[in-house]
Curated annotation (Swiss-Prot):
Essential acyltransferase that catalyzes the terminal and only committed step in triacylglycerol synthesis by using diacylglycerol and fatty acyl CoA as substrates. Required for synthesis and storage of intracellular triglycerides. Probably plays a central role in cytosolic lipid accumulation. In liver, is primarily responsible for incorporating endogenously synthesized fatty acids into triglycerides. Also functions as an acyl-CoA retinol acyltransferase (ARAT). Also able to use 1-monoalkylglycerol (1-MAkG) as an acyl acceptor for the synthesis of monoalkyl-monoacylglycerol (MAMAG). It catalyses: an acyl-CoA + a 1,2-diacyl-sn-glycerol = a triacyl-sn-glycerol + CoA; all-trans-retinol + an acyl-CoA = an all-trans-retinyl ester + CoA; 2-(9Z-octadecenoyl)-glycerol + (9Z)-octadecenoyl-CoA = 1,2-di-(9Z-octadecenoyl)-sn-glycerol + CoA; 1,2-di-(9Z-octadecenoyl)-sn-glycerol + (9Z)-octadecenoyl-CoA = 1,2,3-tri-(9Z-octadecenoyl)-glycerol + CoA. InterPro entries: DAGAT. Belongs to the diacylglycerol acyltransferase family. This is Diacylglycerol O-acyltransferase 2. Inhibited by niacin. Pathway: Glycerolipid metabolism; triacylglycerol biosynthesis.
Length: 388
């Protein structure tokens, strides 16, 4: 900026000198200085100043882009962690002020709108196409890989693995259009299923529904698979809170062996099962892992049992530097590979034998998907997917 001001000052001095020369000539005298304008300020000095100005660090385009990416990720992390509680507290505060009518109107609306999330919510293509999600995608970056076509005449249950700390790949790929899920799977409506408790939080519920996120409850899944036509894809992060407790960089493990409820739902509705593995999901946060039997793991399991989620002690990088700790995830590639659908028959009353059969088929398909693609995304041929 100082360079620009100096150049501008030079131009002014040059103009004043030129004006003095013209005045001197009009009175018959010689010009005071023919080199004045060239010496004091020219168009080239302005150009040089502008080049210097736009080369300064704070206006570097790539750095601005990177900071926008960091901010876009941080806003989602904060929304995930505190938006619901913060909005609840703000509304309660407003209720105690002269603006109490705003809180009353919203809570009245909430009563009438309470069951909307169970019916798929209010998807907004405008929100799903926000530019902020493209910055979110590019930060890691996140990529969605399609391996097979999906029929719009069928319904699907996608099993997403692993959970990671926040399921960032699941959110970006299926609750936004940043990776063009609607173009890669035309005619398929993705619904990312998450904890039902999130939809009891004011404002947060509206934010989640706008992205096509719904409660991971039997009522919701039954409705979407039986009363919402065809072409629905419900994404369930099968490992849930239990799987998040073992999330750490370098570890490829899923909690699946005793998770059979999603298979039973698929059989009851004749919805095809689609295994998904997200390479890199576990790499973006570091976590303190408590040993089995420790007080820390006991607390986590109690939270998981009674509240539905397990609190994790984790960290990423800082807002302004990757060398400090903070809530911003590390910039590691996340590649989500959507596998081949497993055709599931419709059985109104599936037996345990039926459930076990298709559950085994699903586990085998997931391991096969992992083995087929692992070397493409930086894992050695010897890497084995741990199924717990």
């Amino acid at each position: 900026m100082k360079t620009l001001i100096a150049a501008y000052s030079g131009v002014l001095r040059g103009e004043r000198q030129a004006e003095a020369d013209r005045s001197q000539r009009s009175h018959g005298g010689p010009a005071l200085s023919r080199e004045g304008s060239g010496r004091w300020g020219t168009g080239s000095s302005i150009l040089s100043a502008l080049q210097d100005l736009f080369s300064v660090t704070w206006l570097n385009r790539s750095k601005v882009e990177k900071q926008l990416q960091v901010i876009s990720v941080l806003q989602w992390v904060l929304s995930f962690l505190v938006l619901g509680v913060a909005c609840s507290a703000i509304l309660m505060y407003i209720f105690c002020t002269d603006c109490w009518l705003i809180a009353v109107l919203y809570f009245t609306w909430l009563v009438f709108d309470w069951n909307t999330p169970k019916k798929g919510g209010r998807r907004s293509q405008w929100v799903r196409n926000w530019a902020v999600w493209r910055y979110f995608r590019d930060y890691f970056p996140i990529q969605l890989v399609k391996t097979h076509n999906l029929l719009t005449t069928r319904n699907y249950i996608f099993g997403y693995h692993p959970h990671g700390i926040m399921g960032l790949g699941a959110f970006c790929n299926f609750s936004t259009e940043a990776t063009e899920v609607s173009k890669k799977f035309p005619g398929i409506r993705p619904y990312l299923a998450t904890l039902a408790g999130n939809f009891r939080m004011p404002v947060l519920r509206e934010y989640l529904m706008s992205g096509g996120i719904c409660p991971v409850s039997r009522d919701t899944i039954d409705y979407l698979l039986s009363k919402n036509g065809s072409g629905n894809a419900i994404i369930i992060v099968v490992g849930g809170a239990a799987e998040s407790l073992s999330s750490m960089p370098g570890k490829n493990a899923v909690t699946l062996r005793n998770r059979k409820g999603f298979v039973k739902l698929a059989l009851r509705h004749g919805a095809d099962l689609v295994p998904i593995y997200s390479f890199g999901e576990n790499e973006v946060y570091k976590q303190v892992i408590f040993e089995e039997g420790s007080w820390g793991r006991w607390v986590q399991k109690k939270f998981q049992k009674y509240i539905g989620f397990a609190p994790c002690i984790f960290h990423g990088r800082g807002l302004f530097s990757s060398d400090t700790w903070g809530l911003v995830p590390y910039s590691k590639p996340i590649t989500t590979v959507v596998g081949e659908p497993i055709t599931i028959p419709k059985l109104e009353h599936p037996t345990q034998q039926d459930i076990d059969l298709y559950h085994t088929m699903y586990m085998e398909a997931l391991v096969k998907l992992f083995d087929k693609h692992k070397t493409k995304f930086g894992l050695p041929e010897t890497e084995v997917l741990e199924v717990n």
